[in-house]
Amino acid sequence: MHTWALLLAAGQSSRIAAACPGVRKQFLLWQNAPLFWHSAVMLSRVSRMRGIIFVFPEDMLEEATAMVRELDAGRALGIPWKAVSGGARRQDSVASGLGQLPAECDTVLVHDAARPFASASLTNSILDALQAGAEGVVPALAVTDTIKVVEDGAVLSTPDRTKLVAVQTPQGFSLQALLGAHRHCAEKALAVTDDASMLELLGQHTVITVEGEASNIKVTHPEDLTMLHSSEKKNMQVPCVGWGYDVHRFGSDGRPMKLGGVPIAGGPGVIAHSDGDVLLHALTDAVLGCMGLGDIGMLFPDTDAAYDNADSAVMLNEVLEKARNAGLLITHVDLTIITQIPRITPWRDQIHKNICRITRLDASSVNLKATTEEKLGFTGEKKGIKAVAAVTALRRVSS
């Protein structure tokens, strides 16, 4: 499955204009970043997301693209992105974004930039449903209010609310199904308010629901701004530091050496249950430390045969996914390899680049050092290798 997201930020914000004159809601600053950026960061932290298409107002495309470029430089998304101009209607903006997807894309998420509270967990549940074969997936919440059908101020009927749900974004689709639905609506001149409606009108695909999130509101009315400010107070981010340490012995019957996910040709064998990547093990422990989740041995015990020669990068990615779902924002990683052999210098740049790729941090946010213990201790006697890691992060806490 090759998934991209369309982030719709092309609206005119007519219903909220009086509360924020001169600024469209998708560009309102919240937690020191425009509203649309929070959704972009969330989407980029979902491991199965391959890229994002930003859809901006045509008259702001150049300015908004420069904004994304600057934001990405400071807090890297870590995945490819493009920016395109939208249209007069929501479906026109979606069509514009669909036209920019790469050839290998086969599934797409469509998300409103005005929903900054959608979580990575919700996004993953949508992707899980798509991976299981669904062609259209929408997050939905049961309707708790009684709904009336009204015409000219007069109540015509009261639908059975047990059959009603309120749908949200992101909405997920098979790309071919969504393209076909868009063509159908264009040919029939049909106007819709969401993409799932297009599949319903085409009548060839089933749209299923997953449980939505009550917190995933859409900023639409002036009073919603109050909720934004309230959320900012309730969901504060506090700095935290995680520390990791790992050691492995050398042995002629050990596994081929890997450091930071990079094979070290000619390095001594490493005795380990998994692949023995001491650097990734230390980093994994440090990330777990930021979340208060113990250590790598608790999550991936060496008594479990499933982790025999397990790829440490896969284990680290699983922990990073937990961190993203928990709202942990990793800002800096500092790593030290301590060993007499092999010399790390020939491999340093490759290791550094790979750590940046895995953590989705820019080069200035990952520091890698190597040192010896001046021939003292077990590393100095060339009996083993150790690594330490310090991770700095922002953790979301509720006041």
Curated annotation (Swiss-Prot):
Pathway: Isoprenoid biosynthesis; isopentenyl diphosphate biosynthesis via DXP pathway; isopentenyl diphosphate from 1-deoxy-D-xylulose 5-phosphate: step 2/6; Isoprenoid biosynthesis; isopentenyl diphosphate biosynthesis via DXP pathway; isopentenyl diphosphate from 1-deoxy-D-xylulose 5-phosphate: step 4/6. Residues 1-239 are annotated as: 2-C-methyl-D-erythritol 4-phosphate cytidylyltransferase. It catalyses: 2-C-methyl-D-erythritol 4-phosphate + CTP + H(+) = 4-CDP-2-C-methyl-D-erythritol + diphosphate; 4-CDP-2-C-methyl-D-erythritol 2-phosphate = 2-C-methyl-D-erythritol 2,4-cyclic diphosphate + CMP. It comes from the Bacteria. 4-CDP-2-C-methyl-D-erythritol 2-phosphate binds at residues 246-248, 273-274, 295-297, 300-304, 371-374, 378. The record marks R15, K25, H273, T372 as: Transition state stabilizer. A divalent metal cation binds at D246, H248, H281. This is Bifunctional enzyme IspD/IspF. The gene is ispDF.
